[in-house]
Design a protein with these regions (language model features):
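Residues at or immediately preceding the N-termini of alpha-helices
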Residues: 13, 80-81
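N-terminal amphipathic alpha-helix initiation
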Residues: 2, 8-12
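Amphipathic alpha-helical segments
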Residues: 12-27, 87-89
Length: 120
């Protein structure tokens, strides 16, 4: 078995793909109305974005009675502040709740949480 992609649902899969392509420096490989895929140039596992017309953004942090986060992406960076600025410039929002010092939680344009983190 080989993991090839993680799939995120969105009302506008192409817009979300463009956001992550900008953030990660990856290329769009497949661009269809209901599914867009990205992969790094090294051929590793990528990200796919599929049309979910009724997508409801998850609530971060967890709250009872609202849409729950089912997964999130962890993205290792060298410089947390510079990467955070790039994420904001690409269209992310900084989450109000920040649980750890070496991790920053952001919300992508579809409302999915993702983390930028550094080892240092």
């Amino acid at each position: 078995m080989k993991l090839t992609s993680t799939v995120l649902g969105a009302r506008d899969p192409r817009a979300l793909a463009v956001f992550y392509a900008t953030l990660l420096g990856w290329s769009i490989k497949t661009d269809e109305p209901e599914r867009v895929t990205l992969h790094p140039d090294d051929g590793g596992p990528g990200l796919s974005f599929q049309l979910e017309p009724d997508h409801v953004p998850p609530e971060w942090p967890h709250a009872n009675g609202v849409q729950q986060m089912q997964m999130h992406l962890d993205i290792e960076v060298d410089d947390l502040d510079a990467a955070g600025a790039a994420a904001i410039d690409a269209g992310a929002g900084l989450a109000a709740f920040q649980p750890q010092e070496k991790v920053r939680v952001y919300l992508d344009p579809a409302g999915h949480p993702f983390c930028l983190w550094t080892r240092e």
